[in-house]
Regions:
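Periplasmic N-terminal accessory/gating domains of Gram-negative outer-membrane beta-barrel systems
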Residues: 89-247, 266, 273-284, 288-297, ...
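Solvent-exposed loop/turn elements at secondary-structure boundaries
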Residues: 167, 550-577, 581-738, 839-856, ...
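Gram-negative outer-membrane beta-barrel transporters
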Residues: 544, 682-830
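Hydrophobic, lipid-facing positions within transmembrane beta-strands of outer-membrane proteins
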Residues: 180, 211, 237-239, 289-293, ...
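C-terminal beta-signal and adjacent terminal beta-strands/loops
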Residues: 678, 691-692, 696, 812-845, ...
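Transmembrane beta-barrel wall of Gram-negative outer-membrane proteins
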Residues: 253, 283-364, 385-413, 578
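Periplasm-facing N-terminal accessory domains of Gram-negative outer-membrane beta-barrel systems
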Residues: 2-6, 13-141, 160
Length: 926
């Protein structure tokens, strides 16, 4: 069965099983509690009404059950008033209840005897502790997004969340043109999930952890970051970023936001010790700006709302230690334009629809190529990124059926088309050269890429809700395809060592690959309130099928035209993931909770894992190169063809029949306590263990085909055993995707968090201490050279982290705010490149090995403090807020990337934390 045919069948089955899409469950909140009379007895039959301007329908209602319990689900974030009424009793109204995303606010009430028209109104603080939910999350509402200085991007904002680590820290929006990976509590690089209003908008290509889209800050009402004990509707365990969009409203409102900086507004943080390491010029800002306009309101009050926003932002940065042919420092120049329109329709009282269209265009003048990773690039060897088509389209429906049934449905699509073309100034006949010792690329980009993809999400859920029990069942279907087409100058890559000819790669371009995937999930999530205990058991089933459709490639320099048959169902995973969360309201007062859980998650996967099995994929031979005339241009007569290794035509790969989907078990336990009226603290333990990790091995060359050879380890002054491949296996390739049971990774950590809101101030923050240790799983481990020192610190291990932010309203409408990011630097590797000059007769020609375990060396401590000062001017309903931001207040210059190859350039930085940056701007709102 083809993937396309399978997709249609799955969608049909999903439609029959449930009414509609489900990830939206992660977007919504709830209000729950118990109603009693003045003697303490429970009151059944009480009508409970939640009202908010955030609801286009205005109000949502429920009735207490025989235990006096009620629960109102599927509420949007906002400020609510809750009214309790029962004949023979005075009505009670609680006002000013702030409800963030994915939070259950416990609002209890006591009714006294009296006439119904007699009422008691109470204005009080919102609950700070969710005593029913077991999910760990942090919410950045619109006030925080506007107040705390960040790069106005979900990834930059996420760097303020306790426990979250990333490879490159953002300084004042200088890194928001890319999408860095976020990890939390030892999660995988793959396990980032992006949701728009609760609907997953993930790219099915690459590793599955990208969106292929850049987000408009003006669209966001708030952003929720869920990090542990996730429910069954969550696809994986890691950082779940849920972006809640504005819905418009019954009044017209809008904003204009402008901010920017240039190179004269940044401090010099190039120190002498960095210069001594060979860092001649630091990475720094050339110019950065952000313009964001929003407008929302009613088309028809209480019936149809609209919200639109346009954003144009740019970050042009000078690259560290990278120069043009004229000696000028190279610039990474880029900008993004985005326009979004959103409609919310209340068709009938119990049926709501939302329509969302978001178009984004990115241009990047000098992007590093996608094939070779190097610390230094001649700008002429970069690529130009241009966008042909990139948008998000989403339709969502939700319905309240009586007092106990809720249904939701959504469909999402994301096409991605962009080109990574050669730099226009590159010489016509130039070919790419890679110096493996200096870690530098020159001449021209190694290749040009044409990328295209289509993604679709269909999902649905039905919820049954009573006061003490709720059950949700649903389905999620994620399907699509991803394709890359490759071309190269001369179909060759020249490799040098410190400027001396070493070898060449003869490449089978024009080539490429296209893969398809269908990921289907069924889930059930239960929640039982049993006295002071709430149990949240869940079960998730997933089926993931990956295929390679039929495809072809034209003739190249070294290869003829080629046609390849389809390979259907290469991967066919069926997994079951149980999850159990709990929460104990210790004193039954909604202020103290002990919570935690045990959860199994599949690892998020993209179709990239079957690319090595695609016969059209890029492949090459590595051949010795003897540059006899010394011109550093490889002629055919200088290529020693008899000693080539590898293959120009990938042999048909295989998937081990026993291949398992990688998964993880997560263990959490934490104590949360509200102290006084305004402060909540928590302390928790987080554990994670990965299993069933896989890699692609060359089964044609087993580990027994290697002979040990002893060489000197230049770092330890001891011997190091490396392995020489049997010449009889030269050129033999049979890739097999296989699970290696001996591979594992695990994390253990503790975390303290504080969240305070006062009349004039707010503060949030956390301290995380943890260690992420295990095996790397990215190489052919049939080759024993890749097992050398393979166990060490993994991922973005950062032993100590401090994250936080604050805001304080000074007299005269002056707002002072800031944030802090302190962290241990990430672990480094030390790579020894073994060549024939070290081991004469080395069959592989070149072999990389780790001289020491990853983490024996590490990057330095990062200390980032950002501040913002805002003055508010008001005139009628309009506010003008000029803004002054200072990022990296202490001018930290911690190295974030450096040459890790042993040689003359070892330790030479290629990037550091950007220096102190001042940005000025302002906001007009009405």
């Amino acid at each position: 069965m083809t993937t396309s045919g399978f997709t249609h069948r799955i969608v049909l089955v999903a439609t029959l099983l449930t009414i509609a899409p489900a990830p939206s469950a992660l977007a919504q909140s709830a209000i729950a509690g118990v109603v009693r009379d003045s003697s303490g007895g429970v009151l059944p039959g009480v009508s409970v009404e939640a009202a908010s301007a955030a609801l286009i329908e205005g109000t949502r209602t429920a009735v207490t059950d025989t235990a006096g319990s009620y629960k109102i689900e599927n509420l949007r974030p906002g400020v609510y008033a809750v009214t309790f009424t029962l004949t023979g009793f005075r009505s009670v109204k609680r006002e000013g209840i702030g409800l963030p995303t994915s939070f259950t606010a416990t609002i209890n009430a006591e009714l006294s005897l009296g006439q119904l028209q007699e009422s008691v109104t109470v204005t009080g603080e919102s609950p700070l502790v969710d005593v029913r939910g077991s999910v760990s999350q942090s919410v950045m509402n619109r006030e925080r997004l506007d107040t705390i200085p960040t790069g106005k991007d979900p990834f930059a904002v996420g760097q303020l969340i306790a426990g979250v680590t990333t490879q490159t820290p953002d300084v004042g929006g200088t890194q928001v043109m890319q999408q860095p990976t976020l990890q939390v509590h030892g999660s995988s690089n793959n396990d980032n999930v992006f949701m728009l209003d609760g609907v997953q908008i993930q790219h099915i290509g690459f590793g599955g952890n990208q969106t292929g889209f850049y987000f408009n800050d003006g669209l966001m009402e708030e952003i929720g970051y869920q990090t542990s004990s996730l429910p069954a509707e969550a696809p994986v365990g890691g950082v779940q970023i849920n972006m809640i969009p504005h819905d418009g409203g019954n009044t017209y409102h809008g904003t204009v936001f402008i901010t920017g900086a240039n190179d004269r507004m940044q401090a010099d943080n190039l120190s002498q010790n960095l210069v001594d390491l060979g860092f001649r010029k630091q990475n720094r800002v050339q110019s950065v700006y952000d313009v964001n306009v929003t407008l929302g309101g009613p088309v028809r009050r209480d019936r149809l709302w609209f919200f639109g926003t346009f954003r144009r932002w740019s970050a042009n940065n000078f690259l560290g230690n990278t120069f043009t042919s004229t000696g000028e420092q190279a610039v990474d120049d880029q900008h993004i334009s985005d326009a979004t329109i959103r409609f919310t329709l209340q068709a009938k009282k119990n049926n709501k629809f939302s329509f969302h269209y978001d178009r984004s265009i990115k241009w990047r003048g000098h992007r590093p190529n996608n094939w070779l990773t190097a610390s230094l690039n001649d700008p002429i060897s970069d690529v130009v990124q241009t966008t042909q088509l990139n948008y998000i389209g989403e339709i969502k429906w939700s319905s309240t059926i009586g007092n106990r049934l809720l249904a939701e449905a959504a469909m999402f699509t994301l096409p991605v088309n962009y080109t990574l073309g050669f730099e226009p100034d590159a010489a016509g006949g130039a070919v790419a050269t890679f110096d493996q010792i200096r870690s530098a690329i020159s001449g021209v980009s190694p290749r040009m890429d044409t990328n295209s993809a289509r993604m679709f999400t269909y999902a649905g859920n039905v919820s049954y809700v009573t006061g003490s029990h709720s059950l949700k069942v649903g389905t999620q279907v994620r399907t699509g395809w991803s394709q890359e087409l490759f071309t190269m100058r001369g179909d060759i890559l020249q490799i040098t060592s410190n400027g001396v000819a070493n070898s060449v790669r003869l490449v089978n371009t024009p080539s490429g690959h296209k893969e398809e995937g269908v990921n289907t999930a069924l889930f059930a999530q239960d929640s039982w309130r049993l006295g002071r205990w709430t149990l949240n058991p869940g079960l998730r089933y997933e089926k993931y099928v990956m295929s390679i459709p039929a495809q072809s490639a034209p003739a190249g320099t070294w290869t003829p035209a080629r046609d390849f048959a389809a390979q259907n169902g290469i991967v066919n995973w069926n997994t079951v993931s149980p999850r159990l969360g709990f929460s104990w309201d210790v004193f039954d007062d909604g202020r103290t909770a002990v919570k935690g859980g045990v959860s199994r998650y599949d690892r998020l996967e993209g179709v990239a894992i079957i690319q090595p099995l695609n016969q059209r994929n890029i492949s090459f031979q590595t051949c010795p190169w003897s540059d006899t005339n010394g011109d550093l241009i490889a002629q055919n007569s200088e290529i020693v063809s008899a000693r080539c290794t590898g293959s120009l035509q990938p042999t048909l790969g295989n998937v081990d029949p026993g291949l398992k989907r990688p998964h993880q078990w997560e263990y959490t336990a934490l104590l949360q306590r509200q102290i006084g009226r305004f402060t909540a603290v928590s302390v928790g333990y987080y554990g994670r263990r990965f299993a069933d990790l896989y890699t692609t091995v060359n089964a044609a060359v087993p580990s027994t085909a290697y002979t040990p050879v002893t060489i000197a380890n230049p770092l330890t002054n001891q011997t190091l055993t490396i392995y020489n491949q049997d010449p009889a296996t030269r050129g033999a390739v049979r890739n097999v995707l296989t699970t290696l049971p001996e591979l594992e990774q695990h994390y253990n950590g503790v975390e303290l968090q504080v969240n305070t809101r006062l009349n004039r101030a707010t503060m949030f923050g956390g301290l995380t201490i943890g260690r992420d240790y295990g095996d790397q799983d990215s190489n052919d481990l049939n080759n024993p050279n890749f097992r050398i020192n393979n166990t060490g610190l993994v991922g973005f291990d950062s032993t100590y982290q401090v994250r936080g932010g604050f805001s304080y309203r000074l007299p005269a409408d002056v707002q002072f705010s800031g944030s802090i990011r302190e962290a241990t630097g990430l672990p480094q590797m030390r790579i020894l490149i073994v060549t024939t000059s070290i081991v004469p007769g080395l069959t592989q020609v070149t072999q990389n090995v780790q001289a020491v375990p990853r983490g024996d060396y590490g990057y330095p401590w990062q200390n980032l403090v950002d501040l913002r000062l805002v003055k508010v001017f008001k005139s009628g309903g309009t506010k003008f807020e000029p803004t002054l931001d200072v990022y990296n207040l202490f001018n930290n210059n911690a190295v974030t990337n450096a040459v890790t190859t042993i040689g003359s350039s070892l330790g030479r930085p290629s990037a550091i934390v950007m220096g102190t940056l001042v940005r000025v701007g302002g906001r007009i709102s009405f």
